[in-house]
């Protein structure tokens, strides 16, 4: 606590009431005492490092102006400017000079230097890089790139020669069919001379002669197989002996309705329904009456094939009776 002044000191410092001039001089010579808040605000710059974000802003505004001789280390700015926002910069790592990706790109750059000029400029700019990332290319890298280019060129030539040698004659386009044309008779003087060197067309024609023979053989074989298949389906897959015993004329497809005529069938099956007309044969009217008109073609053919199969079995086993088709 602050001690109060005594009465004697007050009497000495207080001027007399009659001398007003002395009182005015005393007031001018001795300034008024500052309060604790004002003294703290005046000495604030000595103890506070920064005034940003302080809670005593209004106190600094009401501060008493100081003497011109007083200097502060950290003067208070009149206008508080916002601090710039610091952004984190992400630095990209430069590619390693011995990276496999760079090696492949360098090889492509060496190969295609004459093909694409714009790409060449871009690749040069990429490999040169900035001033900080410039790195001298070692002679070993250059030597490896040259060796790789030489090996790749040799491999390309080797593959091309192998493909040309291994290309079969069948890959050539088929020759146009040769049409025999009768050439007019020319006199002996106008007859063209036979060239010494044979042209490529003649060579191809001579090479394709064997192929033409094979095509003729295939066509003959195909026609034979087709005839055999037609015979098989015409006689319902029966053996030639069965067909001969039943009669080939009974398998003719003259009309849509299959009406086989059984005239030459002679079997020891007297109890069957066909034995009644074994002398005169099966009449067409009776067969048409047996086969209804509403029966489909597939069902009718299936019944006939089943009946023929039964006939074959009856021939193999004479004891079995021959039944009429359903």
Swiss-Prot record:
GO terms for cellular component: cell cortex; centrosome; microtubule; nucleus; spindle pole. Residues 209-221 have a biased composition (Polar residues). It comes from the Eukaryota. The modification Phosphoserine is found at residue 255. One of its GO terms (molecular function) is alpha-tubulin binding. GO terms for biological process: positive regulation of cell migration; positive regulation of phosphatidylinositol 3-kinase/protein kinase B signal transduction; regulation of cell projection assembly. The keyword Nucleus applies. Its main location: cytoplasm. Keywords: Cytoplasm, Cytoskeleton, Microtubule, Nucleus, Phosphoprotein. It is found in: Cytoplasm, Cytoskeleton; Cytoplasm, Cytoskeleton, Microtubule organizing center, Centrosome; Cytoplasm, Cytoskeleton, Spindle pole; Nucleus. Residues 1-37, 51-80, 201-221 are annotated as: Disordered. Interacts with AKT1; the interaction is transient and follows AKT1 activation. Interacts with PPP2CA and alpha-tubulin. May play a role in microtubule organization. May play a role in cell spreading and cell migration of epithelial cells; the function may involve the AKT1 signaling pathway. Belongs to the FAM110 family. This is Protein FAM110C. It comes from Rattus norvegicus. The gene is Fam110c.
């Amino acid at each position: 606590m602050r001690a109060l002044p005594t009465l004697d000191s007050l009497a000495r410092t207080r001027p007399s009431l009659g001398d007003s001039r002395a009182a005015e001089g005393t007031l001018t010579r001795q300034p008024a005492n500052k309060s604790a808040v004002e003294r703290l605000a005046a000495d604030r710059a000595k103890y506070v490092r920064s005034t940003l974000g302080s809670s005593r802003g209004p106190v600094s505004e009401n501060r008493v102006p100081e003497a011109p001789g007083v200097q502060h280390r950290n003067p208070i700015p009149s206008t508080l400017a916002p601090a710039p926002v610091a952004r984190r910069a992400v630095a990209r790592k430069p590619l390693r000079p011995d990276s496999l990706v760079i090696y492949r790109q360098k090889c492509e750059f060496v190969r295609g230097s004459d093909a694409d000029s714009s790409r060449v400029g871009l690749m040069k700019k990429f490999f040169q890089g900035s001033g900080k990332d410039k790195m001298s290319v070692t002679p070993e890298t250059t030597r490896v790139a040259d060796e790789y280019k030489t090996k790749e060129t040799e491999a390309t030539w080797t593959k091309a020669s192998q493909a040309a040698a291994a290309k079969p004659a069948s890959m050539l386009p088929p020759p146009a069919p040769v049409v025999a044309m009768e050439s007019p008779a020319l006199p002996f003087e106008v007859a063209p001379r036979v060239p010494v060197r044979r042209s490529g067309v003649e060579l191809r024609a001579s090479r394709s002669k064997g192929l033409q023979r094979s095509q003729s053989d295939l066509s003959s074989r195909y026609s034979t197989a087709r005839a055999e298949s037609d015979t098989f389906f015409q006689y319902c897959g029966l053996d030639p002996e069965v067909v001969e015993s039943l009669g080939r004329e009974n398998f003719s497809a003259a009309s849509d309705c299959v009406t086989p005529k059984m005239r030459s069938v002679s079997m020891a099956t007297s109890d069957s329904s066909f034995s009644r007309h074994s002398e005169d044969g099966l009449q067409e009217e009776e067969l048409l009456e047996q086969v209804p008109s509403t029966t489909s073609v597939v069902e009718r053919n299936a019944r006939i094939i089943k009946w023929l199969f039964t006939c074959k079995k009856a021939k193999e086993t004479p004891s079995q009776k021959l039944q009429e088709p359903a």
